[in-house]
């Protein structure tokens, strides 16, 4: 039944579904109405656009070919880095390593931390320390995904435009980060702040909703949905953000 399913389209729809659930929670609670919902709304619209463009693409590859490449990428490695599909014009890189990459050649400032429903470990969010001073919109998130053996996943989003980029352009960190030049500064700013806005919304909604019930009961988890409906495939390689 799902032999011709398009990975990219499904991933985009699942991502939009998750954002829609968060948006519903925010709108249902007047106490969090002061939080800007524009980034979530834009993300939901982009998810539908990406799904439609993927389904209608004349160059779409057969499912079994792309699936074989995805499965090959799941072989455990000591340390691996992978380019992840993103929004048009945006490239995201992910790195799995036995130790957290605290020194990747750049200076980061932590701006958020949250508990992930399907994980025992919290996810930490960072942005470039020069985000305000030099309008550098590079961000990253770090999360331990298993403890035996330990594996830390670092996801990089955006390219450093600060002065530090020229000093460290040969470091491991700069190799992990890339933005297509077609992305304008205004788009970069919007994409870089979506993660931060989502964290603020979820934290505030959790604070209110947990007074009576758990907000997670109202959020559909992509990985659980994917595992139940499409057990032959993994959602990890389809992560958009």
UniProtKB/Swiss-Prot annotation:
Q: Which one of the record's GO molecular function terms can you name?
A: DNA-binding transcription factor activity
* DNA-binding stretch(es), residue numbering of this chain: 97-165
Q: Which GO terms describe its biological process?
A: abscisic acid-activated signaling pathway; regulation of DNA-templated transcription
Gene Ontology terms, cellular component aspect? nucleus
What subcellular locations does the record give?
Nucleus
Q: What is its main location?
A: nucleus
InterPro entries, alphabetized: WRKY_dom, WRKY_dom_sf, WRKY_plant
Q: Does the keyword Ligase apply?
A: no
* Disordered as annotated region, ranges: 56-79
UniProt lists the family membership as follows: Belongs to the WRKY group III family.
This protein is called Probable WRKY transcription factor 63
Can you name the source organism? Answer: Arabidopsis thaliana
Gene that encodes the chain: WRKY63
């Amino acid at each position: 039944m799902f032999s011709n399913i398009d990975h990219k389209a499904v991933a985009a729809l699942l991502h939009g579904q998750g954002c829609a659930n968060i948006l519903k929670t925010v709108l249902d609670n007047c106490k969090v109405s002061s939080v800007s919902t524009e980034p979530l709304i834009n993300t939901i619209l982009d998810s539908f656009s990406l799904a439609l463009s993927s389904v209608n693409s004349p160059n779409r590859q057969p499912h079994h070919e792309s699936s074989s490449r995805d499965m090959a990428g799941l072989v455990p490695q000591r340390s691996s880095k992978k380019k992840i599909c993103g929004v048009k014009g945006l490239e995201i890189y992910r790195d799995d390593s036995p130790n957290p990459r605290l020194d990747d050649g750049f200076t980061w400032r932590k701006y958020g931390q949250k508990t992930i429903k399907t994980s025992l470990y919290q996810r930490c969010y960072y942005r470039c320390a020069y985000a305000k001073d030099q309008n550098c919109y590079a961000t990253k998130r770090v999360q331990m995904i298993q403890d035996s053996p330990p594996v830390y996943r670092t996801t990089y989003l955006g390219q450093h435009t600060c002065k530090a980029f020229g000093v460290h352009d040969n470091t491991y960190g700069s190799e992990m980060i890339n933005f297509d030049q077609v992305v304008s500064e205004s788009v970069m700013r919007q994409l870089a702040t979506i993660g931060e806005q989502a964290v603020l919304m979820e934290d505030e909604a959790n604070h209110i909703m947990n007074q009576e019930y758990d907000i997670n009961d109202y959020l559909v988890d992509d990985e659980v949905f994917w595992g139940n409906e499409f057990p032959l495939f993994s959602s990890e390689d389809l992560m958009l953000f």
